Amino acid sequence: VTRIIAGSAGSLRLATPGPTTRPTSDRVREAIFSRLEAREGFHGTILDLFAGTGALGLEAASRGARHVVMVEHHSGAQKVIRRNIATVSPTLPSATTLQAVSARVESYLQAPPTLTVDGVFL
């Protein structure tokens, strides 16, 4: 079971698209975010590239990121990301924006929107 670990959406379960997409495990996400929060926290814009379920980007939003862009090409994973956004959004501050982009990461990075990005997950 994949879930949001901490923050405003802590313990909410996330949908997964099936065996072809493997979300980052709770244990790995917990280690990543513990380390990052000790350094700087999450308050700006996060890119979640090859987003899969969106778990990393949604975890960042739950912990305070103001804007999260999740880029994923696979249509099944895109549907799951949109479902997970719908699950997590009501728990976030109204100023938080979550964006799902259906594109190949390589194409997205060739002409990205003009954003100041504070963190990138690959």
Where does each model-flagged region fall?
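Class I S-adenosyl-L-methionine-dependent methyltransferase catalytic core
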Residues: V1-L122
